[in-house]
Regions:
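Hydrophobic, small-residue-rich transmembrane alpha-helices and their short perimembrane loops
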Residues: 1-160
Length: 160
């Protein structure tokens, strides 16, 4: 019973890590895409530039996916080995270790999408502003990367 609860918690950790980051990416891409759609009705030649700005918040979803794989890998579930060592306490540790990726992905994805939407308006006024719009939106990416780093350090300490 103890091992079963721990394994369920590890799977929950993987799901929560991924889904939170997926939500952040989806909402962020929605915000940027909504702004881009308005611009593209008037200036369809800006499609490739708008696509770049809309895609930026998608990276948080990738981080969430990687985080889920890391949790399943570090716990030994992907390898299919002996899982009897995954206690309830260990399961909780994996769940906590995934939260930095999930929460950083959720919030940074949403805020990056909001900034990217503003960047869409910058580019609509002057195409030369694309680089500036990308840099400003990419600054928010830093926090998602820090979330990945913290989760990785926690996972290494659990498995070690």
């Amino acid at each position: 019973m103890e091992s079963t609860i721990g394994i369920v918690l590890v799977f929950t950790a993987a799901v929560v890590t991924a889904v939170l980051a997926f939500f952040g990416s989806a909402i962020g891409m929605y915000l940027a895409g909504k702004a881009a759609s308005g611009v593209l009705t008037e200036r369809p030649e800006l499609f490739s530039k708008m696509l770049i700005l809309q895609a930026l918040p998608g990276s948080q979803g990738i981080y969430g996916l990687v985080g889920a794989f890391l949790i399943l890998n570090f716990s030994g579930i992907l390898a299919g080995g002996d899982l009897s060592g995954i206690t309830t306490n260990t399961g909780w540790l994996y769940l906590l270790a995934g939260l930095p990726i999930g929460l950083a992905g959720l919030f940074s994805g949403i805020y990056q999408g909001s900034v990217a939407a503003s960047g869409v308006l910058m580019v609509a006024k002057d195409e030369a502003n694309l680089g500036k719009a990308i840099v400003v939106a990419a600054m928010i990416e830093t926090w998602a990367i820090f979330g990945v780093l913290i989760s990785f350090i926690l996972l290494v300490s659990i498995a070690g």
